[in-house]
Amino acid sequence: MTQLRQAKYRQDYQAPDYTITEIFLDFDLDPAKTKVTAISKVKRLNPQSSTLELFGEDLTLISLEVDGKAWTNYKEESGKLIIESLPEAFTLSIVNEISPEKNSALEGLYVSGEALCTQCEAEGFRHITYYQDRPDVLARYTTKITADKSRYPYLLSNGNRIAEGELDDGRHWVKWEDPFPKPSYLFALVAGDFDVLRDEFVTRTGRKVALELFVDKGNLDRAPWAMKSLQNAMKWDEERFGLEYDLDIYMIVAVDFFNMGAMENKGLNVFNSKYVLAKSETATDKDYLNIESVIGHEYFHNWTGNRITCRDWFQLSLKEGLTVFRDQEFSSDLGSRSVNRINNVKVMRAAQFAEDASPMAHPIRPEKVIEMNNFYTLTVYEKGSEVIRMIHTLLGEEMFQAGIQLYVHRHDGSAATCDDFVQAMEDASNVDLSLFRRWYSQSGTPVLTVRDEYSPEKQQYTLHVSQMTPPTADQAEKQPLHIPLDIELYGEDGAVIPLKRDGSLVNSVLNVTQASQNFVFDHVTSRPVPSLLREFSAPVKLDYPYTDAQLAFLMQHASNEFSRWDAAQQLINNYAKINVEKLHKGEALVLPEHVVDAFRAVLLSDNIDPALAALILTLPSENEIAELFTVIDPVAIHNAIDFIHSTLANEMHDEFLTVYRSIKIDGYRVDHGDIALRSLRNTCLQYLAAADDRELANKLVEAQYRSADNMTDSLAALTAANEAGLPCHAELMSDFDDRWHHDGLVMDKWFTLQGTNPAKNTLEKVRELLNHRSFSMTNPNRVRALVGSFTAGNPVNFHAEDSSGYQFLYEILVDLNTRNPQVASRLIEPLIRFKRYDAKRQDLMREVLEKLKGLENLSGDLFEKITKALES
C-alpha cells in the first residue's frame, strides 16, 4: 500500500517518455475470471528514455511480448510494471486476468446486479490491464468482447459497432471502434441483459444519430424522460454552444451499483440508475430535474472533457467546472433560471464553503494530491463552475462563446490545462484576466465587506468595498482576487436608481480588484437601499449591515429574484444567530412581528412565481446556518431553527391553510408551472404540520399521502409527518415500506427520511435498518441514503454528546475501508471537520480519527483525509 501514501504535486508534471497511439483490447468475459489481452502501438517521446512505466492493480500477468517476442526485461513493483530496454516504436502485447466479482470497490471492471460494467475515472483502468493510466496519453481504441450470449446478450463499448459474430459454444462476440483518440479513463465496457429504449437525433448538419438507453428488465417505462432529456441536451448544445455530436450512436446504461452519479465515457455513458429512471409514481419533481441536469452534464462532456481532456488530474476543474456551468445553463434555459440559481447557491453556501473551512481545503486547481478520488469535490465542480460563471459575467455571452470556439479550435483532440482555457477567453475577448487567474490557485472563501455613505449635498452615494480571504488549511497567505460585484440601487419607492458617474452610466458589475476600493455614484437624490452580490456574482461571503427593514424592502422590491430570496435568507440568518446567542444565555427566543409580516407578504403576493415563494419560505438548513458560526453548536442551531419554523407556522397558520387548499393541480406533468405549484403547496403543508394544531396537521398530511397520485406529493406528506413527529408517521412509513420495499431507488427516499428524523431515538432506528430487507452495505446508493443522511444531514443527532453518532460512523468506516474506500471517504467528511465544534466534541471526534488512523490496512482515500484533519 505504500504507493498510496505518496503525494503528487502539480508542479512536478512531466510529459510521458512514451505514448500509446492505438490499442486493441480483447475481453474474454467471465465474472470469476476475465482474460484481458491488450495490444498497444507505442512510440517514444523522450529520446533519452528506453523505459516504459505502466500502472496495474489487482492483476495477474500471464504474458508480455514486444513486437511478437516474449520480453523478460521487466519488473513489477508498487502497482507498476516497468519495462526496460525498449526500442523507439513497437507493439506491446500484454495478457492478464482479473476477477470482476471480487471487485467490491467498483473501480475497473465489476459486477452490478446481473451485469458487468466499468468505471475508469480517475484511475480505474489500471484495475483492468497494465497501461499508462494517465489523461495525457490519448489512443484510438478498438475493443472486442466475447461472452456467454444467454447471460450477456448485449456487449457494449465505446465508439461504433463494426463487427459481431457467434461461436459454437453458445458464446458471441462484438467488436467496437472509437475513431477519436481518448485517455484510458474514458474507456467503457458493459455486458448484460437489458430492456432497451431506442430513438434518434438528427444533428443540425442532417446526420442521424442512433440513441439507445439500456435499463434493467422491467424498467422500460421509467426511461422516456431520460431519452427526452438527452435529445434536449443535444439540441441545446448545438444552439447555445455550436457543438454537434460526432459518432453514429450514443448509448446510456443505467446500473444500480455505482460510486458516482454518472460517467461520460465516449459514446457509452454509464449512469447510476438514480439519474436515469423516472415515472411519476416513483420519482419526485426534484428527481426529474436532476435526471435532466445529469444527462445534460455527461452529454456536454463530449466536447468539454472528451474531445478536449485534461493534461493531468490537477486540471480536473478544466472539464468539470466548465461542464457544471454548461449543465446549469442548460437547466436554466429549459426551466426557471432563478430557481436553478438559488439551488446552486444553496449548495455553495451549505457545503462548498464548509469544504473551504475544512482540513481538505484546496483551490479549484489543487497543488497536492495523495488519492485522486478525494478531489472530485464541490470545490473542483461547483466552485469551479462559479469561476467559469465569473468569466462569463466579465466577458458577456457573445465574447464568452467566442472564447469557447477559440478554445475548441486550439485544443480539440488534445489534453489541455486550466491556463489554456483562460488564455483562449482572454485572446478572444481582449479582457485582461491576469489577476483573475488567482481563482485557480487560491483556496478559501473570500469575505467581501461593504460599507456605504450618502452625501445629500453632493447627491453622491459611496460604496467602500474591501476583500479578505481567511487563511485555509493549505494556505496561510492570501492575495486580493478579481471579484465581480453585481449591484443595484433602489429609491424609497422601490424604483431602480441608474448607476452614474461623471455624467455617464456605469455597468452594474463592479470590478473589485484591490484589498479595498471605493465606488462613487452621482445623481442619487436620496439615500438608496443597495442590492449587493446580485445573482451571487462571485463565490464569496458578503458582510453588509442590512437592517430588518432594508431586507424586508428587498424581499418585496428587488428586481432580481435571486436577490429577493437572498434578502429573506439574510433575515432568517440574523434571527438564527440572535436566537442561538439567546439560548446560550438562557433568554427567551424572539422572532419579531415585522419579520413574520415580511414572509406573510411573500406567501400572499399575487405577482411572484410560486416556486420562488416556496424557496423564500423554506428556511436555511441547519448545515447552512452552521456556516455562520466560528464554533458550531448543533443543538442550539437546531432549536433556534425549530423555533423560527414553528413561530412562522403558528403566526401564518390561516394563510398557509388558505393557500394550501386553493392550489389545485389536475394530473401530473413535468413542467415549470406545475412543479412550482406543487412546491408551494407542499411547503405550506410542511408549515401546517409544524403548527400547534396537531389534529388538523395529522388529518391534512394523512389525507395528502393517501390521495397522492405522484411521488412528489406522497413523499412531501411523509416528510412533513417525519419532521413534525405526527401521530400518523409510523403508520405511513410502514405503508410506504410495504408498497415499495422491492424498489431500491424509491426506498432510498424512505431510508433518507429515517436518517434525517430529528427524534432522539433515530440512531437506534438507523442501526436496526442496517438489517432491513431493502438495505445492503454493498450498494453505495443505499449507504448514502441511510448512513450518509444521518451523519451529514442530521447534525443534532450525529453530534450527540455521548459520542454515539461518532462511534456509529467509526464502525461503518471500518467496514467500508476495505469494501469500498471511495464511499468511506465521502462519509468521513463530518468527522474531519471536528475543529469547528466545542472542545468536548472535538476530543470525541479526534479520538475516533486516531482509532481509524491505526487501522492496519487503512485505504489511501481515508489516510489522506484523516492525516490532514489531525495535522490541521
Label each residue range with its predicted role.
Residues M1-K35, Y110-Q119, R126, Y131, ...:
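N-terminal, polar/Ser/Thr-rich
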Residues W176, R204-K458, T462-V465:
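Hydrophobic alpha-helical and helix-loop surface patches within well-folded domains
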Residues A350, T377, D522-S872:
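Long, ordered, helix-rich scaffold segments
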Residues T60-D67, D432-L435, T445-L532, A649, ...:
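Beta-strand-rich binding/interaction modules
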Residues L45-S112, D133, D169-G170, V174, ...:
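A surface-exposed beta-strand-loop module
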Residues I98-A105, P470-P471, F536-K541:
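Short acidic/polar inter-strand loop motif in beta-rich domains
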Residues I39-D58, Y130-D133, A139-D148, D419, ...:
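Surface-exposed beta-strand/loop patches in extracellular or lumenal glycoproteins
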Residues V95-R198, E561-R564:
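Extended, low-hydrophobicity, Ser/Thr/Pro/Gly-biased non-transmembrane segments
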